[in-house]
Design a protein with these regions (language model features):
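Short glycine-rich loop/turn motifs that provide flexible caps or phosphate-binding loops at active sites
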Residues: 14-18, 72-74, 123, 183-185, ...
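C-terminal catalytic subdomain
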Residues: 190-200
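Glycine/threonine-rich beta-strand-loop-alpha-helix active-site module
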Residues: 2-3, 7-107
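Contiguous, well-ordered alpha-helical segments that form the cores/surfaces of helical PPI scaffolds
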Residues: 27, 181-185, 200
Length: 200
């Protein structure tokens, strides 16, 4: 992907897909704009995203990054995170920096209409976990709490409907797409806890 970008030289990058596709797009964006960057430097452990040993390069000078989710769960379209898996070792590298934040997110629940039940439930529980962990975070604020609680209310109301009725309930699909983004906005600012650490 990065090689194709370097050859084409786009001024706008649109990542369409689930969390993995959007996260891959973020890393391709970094490597396109800053080919000198070392991936392992970006993947260095840290205690606080705001106090880093490694400084991410400034993003957006070459290309505008737009994220378009096709599943309601990861919230990657509104977060400064990307999880990249080394396919040879199976090791997951969580990258975190506000420079990874997409410049725009387009939330269109029509793209999620035909999600299979398994993806609907798994991604819905992911969104619920994001909201719960953001709400319980020691870095939570009144602003993140509002987003997290609203997301949780919507998920508990609409996830069963989206799972059971799928494409026949566009309202549930729309509400879940919004809830996923709200949960993403909450944890982008309040961060996550031990659940996600253990899962990765």
């Amino acid at each position: 992907g990065t090689k194709a970008m370097q050859e084409f030289e786009p001024d706008c990058i649109i990542a369409v897909g689930g969390g993995s596709a959007m996260d891959a797009g973020k890393i391709m964006w970094v490597m396109y704009e800053h080919p000198e960057v070392n991936f392992m430097d970006m993947a260095m452990d840290f205690m606080d995203i705001r106090k880093r040993v490694y400084t991410f390069p400034h993003m957006g000078d070459k290309a505008y990054f737009i994220a378009v989710p096709t599943s309601a769960g990861t919230g990657s379209e509104v977060t400064p995170f990307a999880v990249i898996t080394d396919e040879t070792t199976g090791v997951k590298y969580p990258l975190a920096d506000y420079e990874l934040m997409p410049k725009m997110a387009i939330i269109d629940s029509d793209l999620m209409t035909n999600m299979p039940k398994g993806l609907t439930s798994a991604s819905g529980i992911d969104a619920m976990t994001h909201a719960l962990e953001a709400y319980a975070s020691v870095m939570a604020t009144d602003f993140t709490d509002g987003l997290a609680l609203k997301a949780l209310k919507s998920i508990f109301t609409y996830l069963p409907r989206a799972y059971n009725d799928g494409a026949n309930d566009p309202v549930a699909r729309e509400k879940m797409s919004i809830a996923s983004t709200e949960a993403g906005m909450a944890f982008a600012n309040a961060f996550l806890g031990v659940c996600h650490s253990m899962a990765h």
